[in-house]
């Protein structure tokens, strides 16, 4: 019996190593062992309708950049390119594979557009952007699978970042009127610099939120109700700050603000080196407020 169970464990472990990504496409599944960009020898420009959002469900990297003209370019082999579905529905460019098993997939997708409102990845594929993206209206970036989103500088009226799975989001800089970021899974959010009016971050999962530099002309809010931590390294907030922990996650804040309302009802601490005018500190759990 022990030998049989050991063989079964080895078999299952080998199977997990052989399949790095499984994507539910609604009426079936896409199973991918390994996706690489090595061996690309075929390029196909897709004719698609106008879009202002991208929904990425491919198991590969999608490279997005801002340009005067809209273009969707599939770079692969001729065989694999034929399996890639690119369709626009209600202004959203949807990227997905035909149902099947792909032990080795050679693929990447390059997209340009003059403007964009939403970038979302739903599977194991990443979205990569470099440089500066100037959006006319609001921008939402979201990952709900294991895929990551990595972006450069962003200028928008309002900016929203959401991580609902294990995927991470890393952004070099954001300049917007309103800034909102939330985590409800195990993925981490990392921002190097944020310049905004209103600022709000929250985590309800195990993922962390980190921000190196913040300048907020209005009020700022940080809430942790899971096990994830929130770290705000260097902040300048002209308005008030509201800091709340109701779980085991900690909030660390360094910088200056007007007044502070800090409350912990769980085991998480609120700490840091923060200069302020007045503080209303409350603690009803094992967590402490030390600012």
Residue spans of the language-model regions?
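Intrinsically disordered, low-complexity terminal regions
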Residues: 2-291
